[in-house]
UniProtKB/Swiss-Prot annotation:
Changing H262A: Reduces enzyme activity. It comes from the Eukaryota. The gene is Xxylt1. Its EC number is 2.4.2.62. It comes from Mus musculus. This is Xyloside xylosyltransferase 1. Belongs to the glycosyltransferase 8 family. It catalyses: 3-O-[alpha-D-xylosyl-(1->3)-beta-D-glucosyl]-L-seryl-[EGF-like domain protein] + UDP-alpha-D-xylose = 3-O-[alpha-D-xylosyl-(1->3)-alpha-D-xylosyl-(1->3)-beta-D-glucosyl]-L-seryl-[EGF-like domain protein] + UDP + H(+).
Length: 392
């Protein structure tokens, strides 16, 4: 009887073990299906929030597999980026994501804009180099018509044989505008050209509130203008995040024209010894938003930055500096940078070598070169105000 009883107990234990193994296999299968679903977002009409939820579920189950070719996803979010690859038990390497964002709107019947996009994307992708575990995530903010233009261009410039992994994510401009408006409404009257003009739309303040719009799974992102030409591997620009001092939330280059010498004229008249609007290296010439490194995690955690978004603070600073601009987010960052420069990591001019010389011919020829000077090997050319970019 003792032998029979022991045999029955052993049989029951083996049955339970088999059930547990079946349950474990089912969980692994579910996780794999979730990951596959993420990589095929482009075939459906995913929303921003649903894609993020799907991503979280996939990451909870297993590491994402290597995609066979660049993906064209709609409103999706990618895994969090980090400075180094992380290894799970068993030696599995977790992908490291790098996020770039560009505005691509009103492009369908705009040949000059399409030409700029071609120059920017072709030079960016031709020089980009990433490790096997790294993924470049290209985010585009656009409406339906421009989205199709971008897809056609990317299919040409991103062949399946690209030397690195790349995902493309589209964000609907109308959806983001609705989310942005409550945050930036108060500041638009100080930094917009007027009703119905290009910068009067709240979407052009996206960088100001990006930390509230993007999911927390994206801790860092670089926002780029389309009138750029890249002369080096964009991967190197992400290393600038490591140079941020404590308290800094945004990396941005100086404005290379006396734009803000002009804008701050009244404050400068009332404060003749101020550095506001003066050229570098001693002065504060303001910022140019063509290339911006946004540490979204730091922006979310900064009490100072959060306070500066409040309408009362915006009005207080605008009144103090007699500030009325027309360049959207660039104006906002310039104004708060005069008051709180510790919020900003200043990029070298070679990361945003601006070429526009408009102010040289409009009253500031005597001081122009002090702002425009930039020494060193250019990494990114910026053909602002439709200035031609040098050929290779």
């Amino acid at each position: 009887m003792g032998l029979l009883r022991g045999g029955a107990a052993c049989a029951r234990a083996m049955a339970r073990l088999g059930a547990l193994r079946s349950h474990y296999c089912a969980l692994l299968l579910a996780a794999a299906l979730a990951v596959c679903a993420f990589y095929y977002l482009g075939s459906g009409r995913e929303t921003f929030s649903s894609a993020t939820k799907r991503l979280k579920e996939a990451r909870a189950g297993a590491a994402a597999p290597t995609p066979p070719a660049p993906e064209l996803a709609r409103g999706s979010a990618a895994p969090a980026s980090g400075a180094k690859a992380k290894s799970l038990e068993g030696g599995v390497v977790v992908p490291v994501d790098y996020h770039l964002l560009m505005m691509f709107t009103k492009a369908e019947h705009n040949a000059p804009l399409q030409a700029k996009a071609r120059v920017a994307l072709s030079s960016l992708l031709r020089l980009a180099k990433f490790e096997a575990h790294e993924v470049l995530n290209l985010h585009f903010v656009s409406e339906e018509a421009s989205r199709e233009v971008a897809k056609a261009l990317l299919r040409e410039l991103l062949p399946p044989a690209a030397g690195f992994k790349c995902k493309v994510i589209f964000h609907d401009v109308a959806v983001l505008t609705d989310k942005l408006f409550p945050v930036v409404e108060a500041m638009q009257k100080y930094f917009s050209a007027g009703s119905g003009t290009y910068y009067s739309d709240s979407i052009f303040f996206l960088s100001v509130a990006m930390h509230q719009i993007m999911p927390k799974e994206i801790p860092r992102i670089i926002q780029l203008d389309l009138d750029l030409k890249y002369k080096t591997n964009i991967r190197e620009l992400f290393e600038e995040f490591d140079n941020f001092l404590p308290g800094a939330v945004i990396g941005i280059a100086r404005e290379m024209q006396p734009v803000y010498r002009h804008t701050f004229w009244q404050f400068r008249h009332e404060n003749p010894k101020t550095r506001v609007g003066d050229p570098p290296p001693e002065g504060l010439p303001g910022f140019n938003s063509g290339v911006m490194l946004l540490n979204l995690e730091a922006m979310r955690q900064s009490p100072l930055y959060s306070h500066l978004l409040e309408p009362s603070w915006v009005q207080q600073l605008a009144d103090k500096y007699h500030f009325r601009g027309h360049l959207g987010d660039q104006d906002f960052f310039t104004m708060i940078g005069m008051e709180h420069p510790e919020l900003f990591h200043v990029l070298d001019c070679t990361w945003n070598r601006q070429l526009c010389t408009w102010w040289r011919d409009h009253g500031y020829s005597d001081v122009f070169q002090a702002y425009f000077r930039c020494e060193g090997h250019v990494k990114i050319y910026h053909g602002n105000c439709n200035t031609p970019i040098p050929e290779d």
